Amino acid sequence: MSACSDFVEHIWKPGSCKNCFCLRSDHQPTAGHPKARANSLPAGTRLPARPENCRLDDEGVNGLAYSKPTIAVKPTMMTSETSDLWTEASLSAEVPKVNWRRTPGKLLLPKQEDEPIVYLGSFRGLQKPASPLACTDGNSRCPPAYTMVGLHNLEARVDRNTAFQPVSFQEEKAGREELPSAHESFRQKLAAFAGMTSSCPKGPRPCTSPQPLRESLPSEDDSDQRCSPSGDSEGGEYCSILDCCPESKDAVHSTEGSGRRGGDCSPTCREQGPRTRPTEEEKQGLSFPRECCGQGSTANPPRLGPKKPSLNSEAASSSDGLSCGSSRSGASSPFAPHLENDYCSLVKEPASGKQQDLSGHFLTSGKCVGQAAELQPASLLRDPVQPEPIYAESAKRKKAAPGPPRPEPKKEQVPAGHSQGQVWTGDTWIQKTPPSWSQDREGANPAPQVATTITVIAAHPEEDHRTIYLSSPDSAVGVQWPRGPSNQDLQAGEEEPLVAQGLTSRESHPHNVTENTAKEKPAIPPKLSKSSPGGSPVSPAPPLTDHSDGNTGGSSVGPQLLSRVPANLTSSCHTNGVATAGDSAKCPPPATSSSVLDQRRPRYQTGAWSRQCRIEEEEEVGQELSQSWGRELENGTADHSNSSTWHRLHPIDGTSGQNSKTNSGMSKSASFAFEFPKDRGRLEAFSPPPPPPKSRHLLKMNKSSSDLEKVSQSSAESLSPSFRGAHVSFTTGSTDSLASDSRPCSDGGPSYEPTHSPTISGKKLFAPVPFPSGSTEDVSPGGGPAQPPPLPQKKIVSRAASSPDGFFWTQGSPKPRTASPKLNLSHSETNVCAHDEPPFNCSLNSGNRSHHVFSSSEPLGKAFKGNAPWAPALGLANSKGGCGSPSLQCRAATSTSSSQLSVSSQASSSSTQLQLHSLLSSISSKEGTYAKLGGLYTQSLARLVTKCEDLFMGGQKKELRFNENYWSLFKLTCNKPCCDSGDAIYYCATCSEDPGSIYAVKICKTPEPKSASYCSPSVPVHFNIQQDCGHFVASVPSSMLASPDTSSKDTAPAVSPQPPAQEQDCVVVITREVPHQTASDFVRDSMASHRAEPEVYERRVCFLLLQLCNGLEHLKEHGIIHRDLCLENLLLAHCNPQSSPGPSATPTVPTTTSRCPSAAPAATTACQGGPGEKQLPRLIISNFLKAKQKPGGTTNLQQKKSQARLAPEIVSASQYRKFDEFQTGILIYELLHQPNPFEVRAQLRERDYRREDLPPLPTLSLYSPGLQQLAHLLLEADPIKRIRIGEAKRVLQCLLWGPRRELVEQPCTSEEVLCNTLHNWIDMKRALMMMKFAEKAVDRRRGVELEDWLCCQYLASAEPGALLQSLKLLQLL
């Protein structure tokens, strides 16, 4: 470490100075060879050197040149004296201590004289004898390959309430020359333990080279200590021992002393049973509640170079969760080769002639290079040193779900001779003590705290291979996102890493299992489940087929994400916080989950990844979806491990050309916004803000899945184009909601397996992603069984049942694992909003890189297309979300997800019972029953109106905004204009970013300076108001501005101007509604039909006028007066809800384009005038250049002050108050093929006219008198007498749907009797309407039409008083 004292806030990269973030080589000369430190103890006799003096940086080996991951760390004072960067909050017994282990910048083969390095985590100086932890190697000596032992907050039983002091890198702390008494005692403990653990089995079971111990640092607020397996809250802290035993069989014996030095607890060696190795040395099962022992003798030079332990950034550090990098992962390990069994304390199972997998490789990111090499000392290092993983853990403090405050770990059935307190970890028994509850920071709250941990681990920091592990035990959030390397070193002897979440069932790796382990039953993973209470026997997990290379022997442990596991670490698969993922490592049942979790607020760490992940955890203690979808397919091996919350993505380095594959799966327990920049190589630190508490959002995958796959497509040779090695497995198990439906997979309950891989879920939202033929997804290199047994089906009670957006992934019917991974969003039609491009548009070449995090409830601000907020659940059973291509271009409609349906049914069950009881209370009374039926019809029609609006509006209710930057993305689909209105010419166009939708390019005819001020009304989207999706000035060919009539030849084929064409700057408006004609065209073309079928035509005119009134009423509600209502400004668009986005999986196609299946036919149809005339067209009000907005509608304070000085007549805009009504009266004449009366009779404008002065309309149908009366009412010369647009709408409704004159022409009827009659009529019409909808619902040939929607609007709001007033206006009374 450099002695640099310049501290800057920057991004630290491995090999960089932690103070100034420059290269370490800039300050520090590289020593030629590691030398024995002055105060280092002799091997086997001396205490391990003080961490301050253990300078891994001085080892004299240049660091590897690889793209170093960036870790965002707080600018904290780093000690310059120690390369191991100890951050000591305090070594006193009261305060836990944080270790900042610094990654050695050099990788070297340690010399014999190097002593093991022991990292002491926070411990509270309470002494406790530790049960033996076996150095699983057969050698009795563990070489000193930089054994790094991290002991995390081992709290003293005496001081429970001591709040953890914030980590401070003060020089006085790091520079202290004298060890505190606690430190001294710990050194004695280490010496004692070194003697204990030095006995590593030889040869056949070599200890792997020291894996950098990635233990999480306790957060500042990590006052609450984890539940340790020891009952007295000290044992079983998250201690991890990095075993550094050379692969050579003649490992030099390290410190042998096993006595309790200085009264410190000395680990006791315990015989664990006969070994299958030649060296029948005892297996040392050490449960170090408080001591972490550094193993490794300096005498024997290990082959394995010391690996660079990654510095856990403070934000990412978890006090208990031990993030460990293991060399067994198929991904490039950050550590040197031959790191087989990284932690002696972890389970290491001797396999005859084969290397044993270390169960508990939390992140096995390195290839299993040492498997055969360990067994064969002559074998050379085959795996280049891999970059270290990056771990980021974030915990948030939350109250545990009510439950027993001190749950006891379940007894595991163990062979005779092993006490109940001992826990079998693979082949090592570890002393297991009852978990102790650590107090809250204040210590005031004795109730257990449940912590939510998010662990972000970029296991492969190098450019081509990155894995991000996101895990949260509490909120059931776990994501591992591996990016397979483009060029992985596929070694013939290397085994594809098998990622076992906590254990591989003993049948999985029979060749790796010792006799001892074969007899043991797997235990529950540390991810605790309420469903398996303490004391209940643990049933063995169903065996999962091991597809790892049989030749390499030990199953390679794939990258395994271990978030803060419950304190019952030693008893759980995670030995000392390390997930034991050994071949058949069995983990005893952990302590119950909800009580033992870390309770810290979420902290986000960027693991050197150019992708950005945000997890919004849900702080919820209620039931959570306990399904775990982590599917481990390292060579098709499915090892379901401890926690249902673990989501494991295993990038596998296929040996001998194996394709590295990973499963992709997602579970909803948190909102994920994966924003991936298009430049993968660009390293950027991203620290998302903490999510709002109690917030649940839909899976915000704003970036298209192309980004997901781009993240994972780094493995060029092995993964399919669409999903190269990207496996996003989000399992949804939550530690505090596993009560009734999920036991951890390692619990082995045969009834179900929480680790359901989303790829095998029955209901897939996305189509399978094909992998190349060479894929060995389900075929092990050794020819092992291809598929694990089908997962048993279980019934899930989702925590998302209360999710407002109903977005959760529920577990589908279990199926055998499919060969090709699918990005499966579960079975519910998740509310995935299309944004900027389809949410999972997994086309590899998608150019869209803009990211916008949005929820399903918020408007699609910049999206190219929206989703229907209500879409009928798309076949909740097995809808594929409309994803039909391998590129997963799925536009998942925001549909009512199955969770929402179940939630509504569950939540409303009680209210429904009450409502039913109320409805049936007066069942004996016919009048009361009819009255209640009428109310039910009214409510149903109101709901139908809303659903019809969603059906007809489709995805257009979401607002879109295009700017000039998108102009080049649009391409015309037809050379001819689709419509020529009064102010603009419309062309059909498609956007390259959204090829499935058709837009209208409106090129304004008015000069650019005048039309540049064009602004659409600032009103919400309405069915009858033209929606401005963006307007800007653009250069267009002059030929495009020519009228279709005058343009005899095709215009430019595209919007881009042709070189010879003369360009003109015009205002271009992008709209969703593609008109096919104006009302003027409609009137001109329908003269013959009006004469032939006057009633049909005039009824259609009534519908057009009704839509006009609806639009004008919407504008007036927002204080806007159009002032330019003419036939040319009224556009007609085709409306066909059957192909609208509501019921379909592609909700973004505008309804106006439903007239044809594809863009080109749509444009052609538009140019030719559209389909048959039977369908009612959609009327759209356009051209707001003359529109006025009433004063007072602004929110600008200055404008409000100015308007406060206006005269009343100006403020009231009395001259414009009923301006649109008057123009609507004129339109009635023009629509009925009559001239404007004020053009024919100019004298009407010069004097006050009366109704009789207006020209009469010809009576051709039963609608003619009503239209004549309505025109007179709208053309009243006195604005006060002129009816409002709302009244005109109700008059039109009466004309269209009644009541008829016969109903009200009863002599001598009072108004009260007439009102009762009208009330009964409304009830009858509502019942008939409900019947009509019911019949159309089951008739596929018939669909809901625009007329039905308009009628629903009328009947839903009709009431006798308004009907009576309308009848009077029509002079029907």
From Swiss-Prot:
Disordered: annotated segments: 31-50, 197-235, 250-338, 376-448, 468-794, 804-823, 1041-1062, 1138-1171
Modified residues (Phosphoserine): S671, S720, S757, S802
GO biological process: cell migration; negative regulation of neuron projection development; positive regulation of Rho protein signal transduction; regulation of cell motility; regulation of cell shape; regulation of Notch signaling pathway
Reported consequences of knocking out the gene: Deficient mice shown complete embryonic lethality.
Function of the protein: Catalytically inactive protein kinase that acts as a scaffold protein. Functions as an effector of the small GTPase RND2, which stimulates RhoA activity and inhibits NGF-induced neurite outgrowth. Promotes Src family kinase (SFK) signaling by regulating the subcellular localization of CSK, a negative regulator of these kinases, leading to the regulation of cell morphology and motility by a CSK-dependent mechanism. Acts as a critical coactivator of Notch signaling.
Leader sequence residues: none
Subcellular location: Cytoplasm; Nucleus; Cell junction, Focal adhesion
GO cellular component: cytoplasm; focal adhesion; nucleus
Keywords linked to the UniProt accession: Cell junction, Cytoplasm, Nucleus, Phosphoprotein
Biased composition (Basic and acidic residues): 250-263, 272-284, 506-522
Entry comment on modification after translation: Phosphorylated by CSK on Tyr-238, Tyr-343, and Tyr-391; Tyr-391 is a primary site of phosphorylation.
Main localisation: cytoplasm
Originating organism: Mus musculus (Mouse)
Subunit and interaction comment: Homodimer. Dimerization leads to the catalytic activation of CSK. Interacts (via C-terminus) with RND2. Interacts with CSK (via SH2 domain) in a Tyr-391 phosphorylation-dependent manner; this interaction potentiates kinase activity of CSK. Interacts with NOTCH1 intracellular domain (N1ICD). Forms a complex with PRAG1, N1ICD and MAML1, in a MAML1-dependent manner.
Annotated protein name in UniProt: Inactive tyrosine-protein kinase PRAG1
UniProt domain Protein kinase: residue ranges: 945-1296
